[in-house]
Design a protein with these regions (language model features):
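Positively charged, phosphate-engaging catalytic surfaces used for nucleic-acid and nucleotide handling
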Residues: 1-164
Length: 164
């Protein structure tokens, strides 16, 4: 309990704790840096959604699904099934490239939303599709240049084992 109180007065402590936990689980420093950045970008997006009146819960989940389906060609549920996840966090099981493209999709959605200021949920759904499409284009180009799929069944357990 003291740790949590300390973190409330100094939020950097909670970031340090998360960093330590990821390291203990075997994640690379590079992946951890990407993951922490993805948390920041997600927070900026959800702040933007709140600003334009999107409701937490079902509406956030719907917009997240639209973004993910657009850039990854899979709903969040389909993506979790591909990676063999049950309750685990999807972002904690993305490769660096998947995380980066997800961040691009979410940051693009936030930027487009700020630019056009959607007035209702239906307009926010269109914005989510546009933001996801920015990352979809990047993903398609990367896959064409490398000959490799970006969206894979690789999960944290697999890429930590491969690192060892």
């Amino acid at each position: 309990a003291k740790e949590r109180l300390d973190e409330m007065s100094d939020p950097e402590l909670s970031i340090d704790r998360a960093l330590k936990q990821y390291l203990e689980l075997g994640y690379s420093q590079n992946w951890i840096n990407q993951r922490l950045k993805s948390i920041e970008i997600r927070k900026e997006l959800t702040d933007e959604w709140q600003r334009v009146g999107v409701k937490q819960g079902t509406e956030f989940a719907t917009l997240t699904d639209i973004i993910t389906k657009t850039w990854a060609d899979k709903t969040t549920k389909e993506y979790k099934i591909l990676k063999g996840l049950k309750k685990e966090n999807l972002r904690d099981n993305m490769t660096n490239t998947e995380l980066i493209l997800n961040m691009l999709a979410e940051a693009s959605t936030k930027d487009i939303s700020e630019a056009i200021n959607p007035s209702n949920f239906e307009e926010s759904k269109l914005v989510a599709k546009q933001g996801g499409n920015v990352a979809k284009v990047a993903r398609a180009e990367l896959e064409a240049k490398t000959g490799k799929k970006v969206v894979t069944n690789q999960n944290a357990k697999k890429f930590i084992e491969n690192k060892l």
